[in-house]
Each structure stands twice: as C-alpha cells, then as structure tokens.
Amino acid sequence: MIWNDGVERPDPVNINNIIENKFNEFIESSKLIERNGLAVGSGGNLSIKVPGGILITSSGSQLSGPKLDEIIFVFYVKANDIYYCGSKKPSSETIMHWMIYENRPDIKAISHVNVGPKDEKEIITSKDEITWGTRELGEDTANTLQNTNVMMLKNHGIIAVDKNLVDATKIVVEYADNKKPYIFT
C-alpha cells in the first residue's frame, strides 16, 4: 500500500501478520530478560525493524511478557510526532529507537532495560543524563551507537543493538546487573 507521503508500507491486515510473525522474538527476548532478573525498575523496551517501520513494545508493557496487543507498529516519526497503528501508545522511547535505526541501517533490533552495568564490564556511557523520551536522548544514543552495539545511558539503563532481537537481548544480559535497577516515576 502506498501512503500519502509516497512510502510503501503494509496495509493494516498485513501489519497484524507482521506482528504475529515477529511476536515470538519478543517472547524469547522477554524470557531472557526475565530469566536473568532484568525485568526490574521501570522496565525498558524492545523493538524490531520491519518493512515500512518498526515494531516496539507499548508504553507501560511489562518486559517480563508482552502481550500481542502491546506490540505497536510505528510507521513514521517526525520531530516529536509519532505515527503508529495499535490500540495502545508506543513506548516513550520510540523516538530514540527510530533515530538509532536511521543511523544504523545494518541493525534490525534494539533491546533496552532500565538496569545499570556489571562492575567488571567496560561499557561506553553517555556523558550526560538526558531526559528519556526526548529527541536529545535519541540523537546522543544514535550517535554513540554508530561505533558500538552496546552502551549505558547515564542513570537510565543498558541499550544494545544487533541483527535480531534475541541477539540484542543477549548483549543486554551480558552487560546488565539486576542489582542496579533504575526506577522512573
């Protein structure tokens, strides 16, 4: 289906098929997060790049086991406006995910938990604490992740990218310490 902006994206029926086809990756990643005690603090978010946009966990969904209706198709982000299909709002970190995918066309998935790093792991950390959900955080994170597949968002959590969601989540598991949750209100 060609949309008004000239970009070809899936129609609503195909969006449901895409979500159903990718749902197992979200479940497998959630199991890894849960098994390693990383579904703590204020959670985090998961996303997968798909034709015409991204699939991302909804705002308020639990990383310990998202439901099918908590996977949202985002088809466009412009400035602070997010265009999506789904019964729930996409994650507040959608802008950050979108900007990472724009900067890294080689990656297809992002895993993010609100947990600090293991002491023995060396990890690039953002210099400043930047408010979550902002374009500033998206720009800083996207720029840093041009040269690495994992980083620590200062006082926020670990984020990792890879070719699929399970592999991105394995990187998060390798670096994240479940005894260091970040809780946002």
Where are these regions (language model features)?
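Glycine-rich flexible loops
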Residues: 1-185
